């Protein structure tokens, strides 16, 4: 919801959505706690594990673009893309963080929900529905592994097994 609200605020305060400097200036104001909710955050940017890029977001973006074209929302998509490209630059300059910050998968999800005419009140429940299986699986792993946190970057040491289709099991 915060990404959607931030982008709505940006649309209301940035006159020319195609002006890179004007969009960057707004992002700098966000970072300086001078715009939107004054928290100093650019919502939808960064991830605890995926610092260089969120592979889910890269895949999702191509589908978002196709939906935006189908729904006649290319200008909105262009603004989201510009923010995705400029935000890491602003964060690096303002916070002196150079390890890499990228859009996470949630950066575009609210935009998709709006294109599908899903009410804002359902965004958070949909967010939870999409993650509950993963959260549950991680909790079960933690219980089995004595509260050791499982990270996606871990490599399995198990021998590789061939996939067996359900019909053959």
Model segments located where?
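Non-transmembrane, aqueous-exposed alpha-helical and coiled segments at domain scale
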Residues: 1-169
């Amino acid at each position: 919801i915060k990404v959607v609200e931030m982008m709505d605020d940006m649309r209301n305060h940035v006159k020319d959505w195609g002006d890179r400097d004007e969009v960057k200036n707004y992002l700098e104001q966000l970072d300086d706690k001078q715009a939107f909710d004054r928290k100093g955050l650019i919502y939808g940017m960064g991830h605890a594990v995926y610092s260089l890029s969120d592979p889910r977001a890269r895949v999702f973006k191509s589908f978002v673009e196709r939906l935006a074209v189908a729904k006649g929302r290319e200008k909105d998509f262009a603004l989201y893309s510009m923010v995705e490209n400029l935000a890491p630059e602003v964060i690096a300059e303002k916070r002196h963080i150079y390890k890499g910050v990228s859009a996470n998968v949630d950066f575009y999800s609210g935009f998709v929900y709006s294109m599908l005419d899903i009410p804002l009140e359902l965004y958070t429940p949909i967010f939870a529905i999409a993650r509950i299986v993963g959260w549950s699986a991680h909790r079960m792993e933690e219980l089995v592994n004595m509260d050791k946190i499982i990270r996606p970057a871990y490599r399995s040491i198990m021998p590789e097994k061939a996939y067996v289709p359900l019909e053959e099991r």
